[in-house]
Curated annotation (Swiss-Prot):
Cross-referenced Gene3D superfamilies: Classic Zinc Finger, Endolytic murein transglycosylase
Gene: mltG
Role noted for this protein: Functions as a peptidoglycan terminase that cleaves nascent peptidoglycan strands endolytically to terminate their elongation.
Source organism per UniProt: Bacillus subtilis (strain 168)
PANTHER family: ENDOLYTIC MUREIN TRANSGLYCOSYLASE (PTHR30518:SF2)
GO BP, sorted A to Z: cell wall organization; peptidoglycan biosynthetic process
Official protein name in the record: Endolytic murein transglycosylase
Enzyme Commission identifier(s): 4.2.2.29
GO CC field: plasma membrane
Length: 360
């Protein structure tokens, strides 16, 4: 009887061990199949084209987010891990025609090979003003710069944009003191067009649509910070125009916000140049007397609207300024920016880093 009990106990243990092994294999197998499924197309036989824009300088995580948002991949994490596993690199910025029937290998191959072909493309650079963008459009299309500016300033067309992009184009653009209603609203990117006869309206809408996509992305943060799209674009444009390649935009943003809180004029030179309507290598003291609502030496607060477009780094800085006590900054000849807290410190920095011939 004791022997039978031992045998029974042995077989029970064996059964438990075997069951555990089976369960373990099922778990491992299930995990493997699930992981494998994440690498497969979203819709295996789909031919649906999805137009994707990869901004310049996008990280793998940012690319994954864009692909997932457009329902081209199943999982951001799976895409990131697979890219790392494959050792893939050299993703190129631009517009791509992808489809939901592509697996991760096909998508990666596409993004590393370069953007899809097009009939023409228009490149809008960061910090470009509306008149410069109009010239860029004119260079690549049948429309003259004058025609482009007229369309960009056309109230009827802008009202159409308001209806199509109500979260982005608002009544703020109709401020009577604004030079160009859509200044700052044409997002910096490269825009390829497949149809050589693309209408001027559609070209402009493509740029507004791109801005609108980022407005949607940052909507909750703007609401949290109690800042409108117009104010965000305005602040971002000031940061963009002041920043050098080596500048800490978040610190520049902190200077502007600190001065606004103290009701000090922003005193930023690019606004004077915008008011004058021309670019100069340096701003003279007489330029500071220009009578314009855009002159931040004569007026407190923000300018009536943006003075240029701005890239994402300036958007980020406008939304997330550093917490500092800085009220002044200046750029050294090598592009580095010196931040100071008092006028006395600022003047010392000017004496140290800026030669007399380059001063106002």
């Amino acid at each position: 009887m004791y022997i039978n009990q031992q045998k029974k106990s042995f077989f029970n243990k064996k059964r438990i061990i075997l069951s555990s092994i089976v369960v373990l294999f099922l778990i491992i197998g299930g995990a493997f199949l699930y992981g494998k499924s994440l690498l497969e197309p979203v819709e295996k036989d789909s031919k649906t084209t999805v137009n994707i824009n990869i901004p310049s300088g996008s990280s793998v995580s940012a690319i994954a987010s864009i692909l997932k948002k457009n329902d081209v991949i199943k999982s951001e994490k799976a895409f990131q891990y697979y890219v790392k596993y494959k050792g893939a690199s050299g993703f190129q910025a631009g517009f791509y025609h992808l489809n939901k029937g592509m697996d991760l290998d096909a998508i990666i191959q596409k993004l590393t090979s370069g953007a899809t072909g097009y009939a023409f493309q228009i490149t809008v650079t960061e910090g470009a003003q509306l008149t410069q963008i109009a010239a860029a459009i004119a260079d690549e299309t049948k429309y003259s710069k004058k025609q482009v500016i007229a369309k960009l300033d056309d109230e009827t067309f802008i009202n159409q944009l308001k209806k199509e992009f109500p979260d982005t184009v608002t009544n703020d653009v109709f401020n009577k003191n604004i030079k160009h209603p859509l200044e700052g609203y044409l997002f910096p990117a490269t825009y390829p067009f497949n149809d050589p006869d693309t209408s001027l309206e559609d070209i402009i809408k493509a740029m507004i649509k791109q801005t609108n996509s980022y407005v949607e992305t940052y909507k909750s943060e703007m609401k949290k910070n109690k800042v409108s799209v117009h104010k965000l674009l305005t602040m971002a444009s000031l940061i963009e125009e002041e920043a050098t390649e080596k500048a800490d935009r978040h610190k520049i943003a902190s200077v502007f916000y600190n001065r606004l809180k103290k009701k000090m004029p922003l005193q930023t030179d690019p606004t004077v140049l915008y008011a004058a309507g021309k670019h100069k290598d340096r701003v003279l003291y007489k330029d500071l007397e220009i009578d314009s609502p855009y002159n931040t030496y004569k007026n407190t607060g923000l300018t009536p609207g943006p003075i240029a477009n701005a890239g994402m780094s300036s958007w980020e800085a406008a939304l997330h300024p550093d917490k500092t006590d800085y009220l002044y900054f200046l750029a050294k000849s090598n592009g580095e920016v010196v931040f100071t807290k008092t006028l006395k410190e600022h003047n010392k920095a000017k004496e140290k880093y800026i030669s007399s011939k380059n001063e106002k």
